[in-house]
Amino acid sequence: MKRTIKTQVLDRAGTLNRLTSIFVRRQYNIVSLSATPTETEGITNITFIVDVSDESSTETIIKQLEKQVNVISALDITNNNLFNRELILIKLGHPDDYQTFEKIIKPYEGQLTILKDLEDYIYIQAIGTHQTIENLLDDLKIYPVTQVSRTGSAGLL
């Protein structure tokens, strides 16, 4: 099961390495990671999306994170997370049938922007939940996707 863990840390060299090693030692996969400075200088929020086997494993991870140097707090915000979004940039081979392409992207209206429409390629930006981004990629599989760049998940309480 996927869990969203939010940490607040002092912005020091090596902190991220120490935190990720906790997951590696327990063989939990980090699905997504994002880090951003807070409004308080020297403090950073790091959000992890992690595959864990059960809730007790999540509690163990939280306790281990809280013991680390430079960690101010660690919380499982999976059930409290009001907003959770990812950003994806896609370079796509230009579709031969543009009307079909427009029908495919229509459900993502408001979440998807065509950044550049060239003769050979289309550059797309989309913002949404993890599942929305996965659905978009699945829908676009009929076209040659030549490049993808995707951020980690960002969440707010």
Residue ranges and their predicted role:
Residues 1-4, 10-45, 52-157:
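Long, contiguous binding/interaction regions
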